[in-house]
Amino acid sequence: MSHDTTPPLPATGAWREGDPPGDRRWVELSEPLPLETGGELPGVRLAYETWGSLNEDRSNAVLVLHALTGDSHVVGPEGPGHPSPGWWEGIIGPGLALDTDRYFVVAPNVLGGCQGSTGPSSTAPDGRPWGSRFPRITIRDTVRAEFALLREFGIHSWAAVLGGSMGGMRALEWAATYPERVRRLLLLASPAASSAQQIAWAAPQLHAIRSDPYWHGGDYYDRPGPGPVTGMGIARRIAHITYRGATEFDERFGRNPQDGEDPMAGGRFAVESYLDHHAVKLARRFDAGSYVVLTQAMNTHDVGRGRGGVAQALRRVTARTMVAGVSSDFLYPLAQQQELADGIPGADEVRVIESASGHDGFLTEINQVSVLIKELLAQ
């Protein structure tokens, strides 16, 4: 008789106070953070990780910004405090694209995230989890919080800021909000403003989480029950379909059944098992509250808001800029990267990452992305 020894899913996969710090360090904002929608957020702190060393004149710092479900653990093994290995292995290290013999690399966990930075799962000043009380934030708010990293290290400007997807949104906001602080800019698979289709894809994901009976309006952290892992699992399945390419799905899975299962008898296709796997995997390292907060921030991303529109906002960017998209990305199609390259003064022509992996190509095509990073840093 077989017994399932798989541990149950946690109500949240967030890093919580008392967990091992791993390779994280923290920077605390000295004042409450003013928010774009009004009001302010007190007690903000950001978790971050670093690789390499600052040079004498502090001119070699590179900022790496993660996507929606990423965190500060860009490279490195899974272990205490880090529920998953690095999400961009092969990019940072001696002799690699971000050569730690030359550059000091900094990667924060985004404001609103769940791996050490202030977010819905973290402790508010009153000692309780923020939960539903966590305010609506924007991509611009996250960047204003990250400015504290410059002060923390005594850096005047970043040698480069780079990011993909939500990380690219943040990188663009860095260059538009603080143009004198960003010398080089790499934007991967990201837009100047979120499109109607991107917002539409996000809508059922948010509904899935909020419809989970264990969501409790966002206040589930210290309540009995499994937490909204079912709703977040549905959201992850929907999102993952948009992250990958149709050709990859056909070539990798086709119409094959999952091993030992028969779809004609109620079993799963292999591609369904793949989506189930990613839903469970995310639940062990991420948080539904952060999923909602950060998805809302991505929905409202618009670099032109309050700046006279996108075209005028892009003209604010003074960094040496490279823009790249993925050939098979239907979530953030190449036309959006073309808009960035056309609008940013001095930007190179759009670079195309050839991949069947869809939007996730900026994460999976390490060799191609490494070439782009090296080229940008050589300029």
Swiss-Prot record:
InterPro entries: AB_hydrolase_1 (IPR000073), AB_hydrolase_fold (IPR029058), HAT_MetX-like (IPR008220). It is an enzyme of class 2 (transferase). Residues 1-24 are annotated as: Disordered. SUPFAM superfamilies: alpha/beta-Hydrolases. Substrate binds at residues 236, 360. PANTHER family: HOMOSERINE O-ACETYLTRANSFERASE (PTHR32268:SF11). It comes from the Bacteria. Homodimer. It catalyses: L-homoserine + acetyl-CoA = O-acetyl-L-homoserine + CoA. The keyword Cytoplasm applies. Residues 60-365 form the AB hydrolase-1 domain. Pathway: Amino-acid biosynthesis; L-methionine biosynthesis via de novo pathway; O-acetyl-L-homoserine from L-homoserine: step 1/1. It is found in: Cytoplasm. GO terms for biological process: homoserine metabolic process; methionine biosynthetic process. This is Homoserine O-acetyltransferase.
